[in-house]
Curated annotation (Swiss-Prot):
Organism, as annotated: Bacillus subtilis (strain 168)
Locations listed in the record: Cell membrane
Record carries keyword Transmembrane helix: yes
Name assigned to this protein: Protein HemX
Ranges annotated as spanning the membrane: 9-29, 40-60, 66-86, 93-113, 132-152, 187-207, 217-237, 247-267
Main location as per UniProt: membrane
InterPro entries named in the record: Cyt_c_assembly, Cyt_c_biogenesis_CcsA/CcmC
GO molecular function: heme binding
Nuclease in keyword set: no
């Protein structure tokens, strides 16, 4: 009963950790102080829950959690979270904190969902199934963000066409101005990219603990990483090259088309993505 409660505690920690990484990503890209504060407080909750788990573990076992790889991963994740909190307070180095927490998230996910000798086969199978559910849910949420971003880009190009042709009318009045459409498409991609990244991390962990062979060259796996790279490049051209407007809208539309090809076509060719 207590072991089940601890497993639920770790699963809740992963969800909160994912939200923290999302807000750190927003702060990293946009220097958003509110997002940074939210990320910090969510990470503080993660640290508290991890500390509770470590204290319980040491109380039950009477030893420090470093005697095997799985235990050491959790302690490693706790150290990374602790360092992230210290860095955030003292130095405010967004780049380092974000990527440190991506690593920490991976470590705690591996610890939580990897079967151990103390767990029954049924309980281990339940954890793996729950990992798969979280992986799929996060992927779908990222797809939802990308879909809305695509809609805003299409509306941008439609509005751009109306203005260029000087076709004034009710359609022009009902659609938001170009700058807002462009900004909303960007914001939704800022949300979608880290969610897809975390989903892929969880998917790789699920494949590692549940499949005999890790299908790195599976069509859907490769396609998903290509989608992540394309949307990451979209953020790159927005932030580094400062390309906005029509160019960004066209690139965003191309990214979404690749996303749809990956979901429907490559998903049907996948060796194990039967849920697609």
């Amino acid at each position: 009963m207590i072991d089940t409660a601890m497993a639920r505690l770790n699963e809740g920690t992963i969800v909160i950790y994912a939200l923290s990484v999302l807000f750190y990503f927003i702060d990293f890209l946009q220097h958003n102080r509110k997002a940074g504060k939210m990320a910090f407080w969510l990470l503080s909750i993660v640290w508290t829950l991890q500390t509770v788990y470590l204290a319980y573990f040491m109380w039950v076992t009477g030893r420090f959690p470093v005697l095997n790889v799985t235990e050491a991963l959790y302690f490693y994740a706790w150290v990374l979270v602790t360092l992230s909190l210290v860095l955030t307070k003292l130095l405010r180095v967004d780049f380092i904190v974000f990527f440190t927490n991506v690593i920490g998230f991976s470590m705690i996910a591996i610890h939580t969902f990897s079967p151990t000798e103390q767990q029954s086969a049924a309980f281990s199978g339940q954890l793996v199934s729950e990992l798969l559910v979280i992986h799929i849910t996060m992927a779908i949420l990222s797809y939802g963000a990308f879909s809305l971003s695509f809609v805003f880009s299409v509306l941008y190009m439609f509005q751009y066409h109306l203005l260029k042709k000087k076709k004034w009318g009710k359609w022009l009045l009902r659609i938001e101005d170009l700058s807002k459409l462009d900004y909303m498409a960007y914001v939704l991609n800022v949300i979608g990219v880290p969610m897809l990244l975390l989903s892929l991390i969880l998917g790789v962990i699920w494949a590692y603990v549940s499949l005999e062979t890790l299908y790195w060259f599976d069509a859907k796996v490769l396609g998903s990483f290509v989608v992540l790279l394309l949307y990451s490049y979209y953020l790159y051209i927005r932030l580094i090259k400062e390309l906005q407007g029509k160019v960004a809208a066209l690139w965003n539309t191309a990214c979404f088309l690749v996303l749809m090809i990956n979901y429907f076509l490559l998903g049907s060719l996948s060796q194990f993505h039967w849920f697609s």
